[in-house]
């Protein structure tokens, strides 16, 4: 049976985990790291780079490097590379493909199923886009799980007693707070709230703005207008933020950041932790509203919370820990989990639940936002309240607003505002063919059905005629099946091209190594080899070197040269063995001719020791 993995598809970093012997294991990537940067780049050669290699070349390839694409999920955002448009789903699929490849290399078997996590406050469109990204990457997404829920699953499953857990999840691009109750294998989400546009990227941006202002004040040059300089500033900002988590100050030093009238200019400034916290106070304040909202919605007092779990790399910032402590009235948050890995571990556990590898665990999640339709006057009429446990199904009867109305348009939205237009539209469809009737008479049953992934299905049915119309809400970013199929083919094509490039590089490396070892062997053993063998081998070495000098040499051409050199190299070995055997035979014959009488004496002694004189031999030993 193919293995299922748990994937935390993050804004800045992603993690993949798997169950081994019932225990979750985080899988290290091909580079040996347990987290993979969610960065995708297109090299000038057309190769797709993902992860650390993409991040490293970002400064020299700014326009073709994409990061933090998670912030665009569920929107109509596009990026153009070589006159080709890429959606957020496709970019995310490249990251997922790498995680899939690394997991397969670790496990030694195919990975087909995955549980992928999303922020609890992700809308329907964002969840749908995440599922599509998985499909494009060649994964069957068996479940979309909220990140805080996965974290609670990983943290609380083995604790035994009933407990109330609050998960404070501040990642690279999103923020969630969730309140959960765990007991006897049941993980139940009571309430959730958050901000899909608040995360570590925003803290980085404040440092970048501060650096740009400092440099402009000192040198009169605006670095924000220089793409390459801006990229260097972003990398330095992220590094400074991390350093300020453990140090009270850091020096940001960027030599040759740009050129001025008098020559090259350098950036060097000290940033203290207190100054950094002053720059980002308002960002911290934005975490307080969702925190209070969750406690209110869950009907739980601070004193009733047993544990607070910090999730996401951004919770390592001391100011974040302090604000959580302040919100909890001085209570220390739990630091017993790895904030970068706990979500993927929870996702792997949920994958195990779905595969039947983990028994007696039930995950009850909630919908983060209310769902409803537009009714007369543009009012938002809610059918499913936020924080309703999913999966769920609700129906209500509506009627027409005009006499003899032939059709009704069902306009669906997600949000908490009173007027439909102020909420996030999810989609609309029309129920046609209604029989003529005075207004208020027709009975139209509208049903909302939310599945375990949090994806919404809506049905409208006229009770008189039995006519029915339905749709799966998929938001503005939704891709049609044909588009997804096309993107899957493109992703496979990129994977094939990348595999060919990797094969070509490996073949080239193998050839260069063979040339080096053969030349070394020739130099060290030149006097022991016959001239005809040396000439043939040197000719093959030179021919392979000429092939390797051509940048456009195909793997087949290189392989042919390697095969030919391999065959002629074998002749060197054969010649060496033949020479060694001849020397050995000559040495044996010479010894036999000159030492025959001595040999007879020695033979007699050996026979004597091994036969009659055993006692003497024993004594001598």
UniProtKB/Swiss-Prot annotation:
Induction record: By stress conditions e.g. heat shock.
InterPro entries referenced in this protein's UniProt entry, alphabetically: ATPase_NBD, Chaperone_DnaK, Heat_shock_70_CS, HSP70_C_sf, HSP70_peptide-bd_sf, Hsp_70_fam
Region of interest (Disordered), residue spans: 580-621
Organism domain of life: Bacteria
Keywords: ATP-binding, Chaperone, Nucleotide-binding, Phosphoprotein, Stress response
Residues where Phosphothreonine is found: 174
Biased composition (Acidic residues): 596-621
GO molecular function: ATP binding; ATP-dependent protein folding chaperone; unfolded protein binding
Sequence similarity: Belongs to the heat shock protein 70 family.
Known role: Acts as a chaperone.
Protein name: Chaperone protein DnaK
Originating organism: Nocardioides sp. (strain ATCC BAA-499 / JS614)
